[in-house]
Design a protein with these regions (language model features):
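Conserved PLP-enzyme active-site core in the AAT-like
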Residues: 121-338, 371-372, 451
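Structural motif of enzymes handling amino- and sulfur-group chemistry
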Residues: 307, 315-316, 323-371, 381-384, ...
Length: 457
């Protein structure tokens, strides 16, 4: 061991090698020097624990240094290939934007824009003017605005409408979303007092009515988008709650969570309420996400009665939680696709959800055949996947995947694919790596084939 440690090359000696001089010209001397030190530190540690008993050749060492250097220069936030079959994969960024949305964001980011400028009047304008008319047209609401995500939207609504008073909501709707974001905690942060009514599995309209007092500021309904209570249950519809609110002059707020502008039942996904239905039911103000079933950028979209939305726009938090020009441009383009009637074809989330099992099976068979020609052992298998993003929690989508039989272990192959310059994220089932076709773009296939050619060689 001591002999091996003494034989480890010096940093300066390695930096003088032609291969690393070439690398330094590309990446910079500082980056290459750091890569050399990292590689030697790792080699030294491997020798000490006994996993390395022979020094690598100079060529092999240079290859390790080069790989380390290039890996360190890759951006931390970068694109991946989602082969999990989960369309709204929260950890992988949820909704993929449409080409139209990407072009719109690029168009306003490369130069100046009309973010807060009224071209007709030649004076300062309102940033929400770019999306408010579209949102009102699509949902039937009187007014609209946008915060930077749905949690922010809920925070703004409760702060503006309920601070210092009570908010009545059902015990069965006290949700927690990702990151321990709990509705009771949000109310406390807004200065509102939570008034729970009903039970976990059953809440009646009379429970809300009996709880109303002089301190009541709002009635809150929360769509349990990431879980369902089934069996002996009862809940109050938005329409019934809105009628109660009107009769007592109390605003009704609804957090729709995922948010949906089209009926997903034809795609096999039922019981996901649409925004239009809640607006038609008379809910005063409601919020939903932009980057889930809508298929746009991250945003907390708020629509409702003008008197409520105006209060929100004037609240100090509105400025702190407002969205930027890239988000507004991408959201406007996404909404325009709905207005044009091309959302199902244009928006990746919807087009992925709309793929039939037969289409997915044919795509899987084609990929499996091409992988077999590259020496990869694989077969086509049937899969069931959740939509993801906390949407439609009790239903799955039938799909097909290419199941790859690894040389060693599925875990080792999964890690290898994950560490590529363009990471490929797969699922493991029965010690095989699954490439689910539902979330694979046509442009992903060549990269996948190249990755498996390299692993097979």
């Amino acid at each position: 061991m001591d002999t091996l440690l003494r034989q480890i090359p010096k940093v300066d000696d390695l930096l003088r090698l032609p291969a690393l001089n070439t690398l330094a010209a590309e990446a910079g001397t500082s980056a290459v020097t750091e890569a050399v030190r990292r590689t030697l530190d790792r080699l030294r540690a491997d020798i000490l624990v006994g996993t390395v008993t022979e020094l690598p050749s100079t060529e092999a060492l240079c290859a390790q240094i080069s790989a380390s250097c290039r890996a360190s220069r890759l951006p931390s936030l970068r694109g991946v290939i989602n082969a999990t079959g989960i369309v709204l994969h929260t950890n992988l960024g949820r909704a993929c934007l449409s080409d139209r949305a990407l072009a719109a964001a690029r168009g306003v980011s490369q130069g100046y824009s009309t973010l807060e400028y009224d071209l007709t009047a030649g004076e300062r304008g309102q940033r929400y003017a770019h999306v408010e008319p579209l949102l009102c047209r699509l949902t039937g609401a009187e007014a609209a605005m946008v915060a930077n995500n749905n949690a922010a939207a809920v925070l703004l609504i409760l702060s503006a409408l309920t601070a210092g008073g009570e908010v009545i909501t059902s015990r069965g709707e006290l949700v927690e979303i990702g990151g321990s974001f709990r509705m009771p905690d949000v109310m406390a942060a807004c200065g509102a007092v939570l008034r729970e009514v009903g039970s976990t599995n059953k809440t009646h309209l009379s429970d809300y009515a009996n709880a109303i007092s002089e301190q009541t500021r709002a009635l809150l309904k929360v769509h349990t988008s990431n879980y369902r209570i089934v069996g002996f249950t009862e809940s109050v519809s938005p329409a019934a709650l809105a009628e109660l609110g009107r009769s007592r002059s109390i605003p009704v707020i609804e957090d729709l969570g995922s948010g949906c502008l089209v009926d997903l039942a034809p795609l096999g996904l039922r019981d996901e309420p649409t925004v239009q239905a809640s607006v038609k039911a008379g809910v005063d103000v409601l919020s939903f996400s932009g980057d889930k079933l809508l298929g746009g950028p991250q945003a907390g979209i708020i629509v409702g009665k003008r008197r409520c939305i105006d209060l929100l726009k004037r609240h100090p938090l509105a400025r702190a939680l407002r969205v930027d020009k890239l988000t507004l441009a991408a959201l406007e383009a996404t909404l325009q696709a709905y207005v044009d009637g091309t959302a199902l074809q244009e928006i990746p989330v919807l087009s992925m959800l709309a793929q039939t099992p037969e289409e997915l099976r044919q795509r899987a068979e084609s990929l499996c055949r091409r992988m077999g020609e590259s020496g990869v052992t694989a077969e086509v298998v049937s899969t069931e996947n959740p939509v993801g993003g906390g949407a439609v929690p009790t239903q799955t989508l039938h799909s097909f995947a290419v199941a790859v039989v690894p040389r060693d272990s599925a875990a080792a192959l999964e890690a290898q694919l994950r560490q590529r310059p363009v990471p490929i994220i797969v699922r493991i089932a029965h010690d095989r790596c699954l490439l689910d076709m539902r979330t694979l773009f046509p442009a992903d296939l060549d990269e996948i084939l190249q990755a498996f050619r390299e692993t097979a060689s």
